[in-house]
Amino acid sequence: MMQDLRLILIIVGAIAIIALLVHGLWTSRKERSSMFRDRPMKRMKSKRDEDEDEDDVDEPDDDGVGEVRVRRSAPAPESAPARQPQHNYQPPYAPSQPRQPVREPVEPEPEVAYREAPQAPLHQPQEPQPVRQTAPQPSQPAPAQPAMRQPAPQPVTEPAPQPEPVAEPVPVSAPEKPQPKETVIIMNVAAHAGSQLNGDVLFNSIQQAGFKFGDMNIFHRHLSPDGSGPVLFSLANMVKPGSFDPESMTDFTTPGITIFMQVPGFGDELQNFKLMLQSAQHIADEVGGVVLDDQRRMMTPQKLREYQDRIRDVKEANG
């Protein structure tokens, strides 16, 4: 507790010492500035007294004594601020110039440089000086700046309303008809393994089945046995190019023939298929061959039903 009290006393004492030092420095500086301000005022007052003495001395009388004038200076009110002198003076640190008696105070020329006027103390009375008002200098008008010419507003032309484009009607294309479904029914008549079909016998059996030699140098079975009407199915050589030459059939041999029918065709395709199967069996019996399917395998009842189903599917799809 004592240590805290001692520390507080030391701090308070240090603050008091610093405050005293600051106050002493401030007081000394204030007195010094007051001394310098009083010097020019005393010098101006003495100069003013000499001028008044010269004005008061008139021509001497017969007795050599002039009239004595007593001038009283009206004390300035204490509350009114002292007027600043209107004459130029030298600062206290400038060298003094020899004073010359003048009758009338010469109006000082306005100084170009800005200089702070000393402030007179309020406690010292001072005789009011006549204030001469200088005639206001006519201010020269500033040269008029040429006005910037603003461009004349251009008339805003609104674009003419464009007609809205009329959408051309898109021609609605008719739905494309589905392509008709097609299929080809193929069966073969072939000789037994290692043998050939004789051309002369083959030619006679083909004619007996109602085929007629025609386009593409192959035989065709028409609606009528005499070769008239639309083609129902056709017969070609199993060996490429698949054509025949009726003039040389006597010396002609082949491993087999191919009978094919395109579906859809003319009339009832199922009836045409039955006629085609009968023709193949007749030729096979005449030349001593066998009837094969499109894979050149032995014809079976299952394969025949498959052919018939394919024909029905095409007819229903194209129905």
Swiss-Prot record:
Gene Ontology cellular component list: cell division site; plasma membrane
SUPFAM superfamilies referenced in this protein's UniProt entry, alphabetically: Cell-division protein ZipA, C-terminal domain
Chain segments carrying region Disordered: 37-177
Transmembrane segments: 7-27
Cell compartment(s), UniProt: Cell inner membrane
Keywords: Cell cycle, Cell division, Cell inner membrane, Cell membrane, Membrane, Transmembrane, Transmembrane helix
Domain of life: Bacteria
Ranges of compositional bias, category Low complexity: 73-86
GO term, biological process aspect, one: division septum assembly
Biased composition (Acidic residues): 50-65
Bilayer topology term: Single-pass type I membrane protein
Periplasmic face residues: 1-6
Residue intervals on the Cytoplasmic side: 28-319
InterPro entries xref list: Cell_div_ZipA, ZipA_FtsZ-bd_C, ZipA_FtsZ-bd_C_sf
Keyword Transferase: no
Biased composition, class Pro residues, residue ranges: 152-168
Function summary: Essential cell division protein that stabilizes the FtsZ protofilaments by cross-linking them and that serves as a cytoplasmic membrane anchor for the Z ring. Also required for the recruitment to the septal ring of downstream cell division proteins.
Quaternary structure and partners: Interacts with FtsZ via their C-terminal domains.
The family this protein is said to belong to: Belongs to the ZipA family.
PANTHER family: CELL DIVISION PROTEIN ZIPA
Protein name: Cell division protein ZipA
Organism field: Cronobacter sakazakii (strain ATCC BAA-894)
Encoding gene, per UniProt annotation: zipA
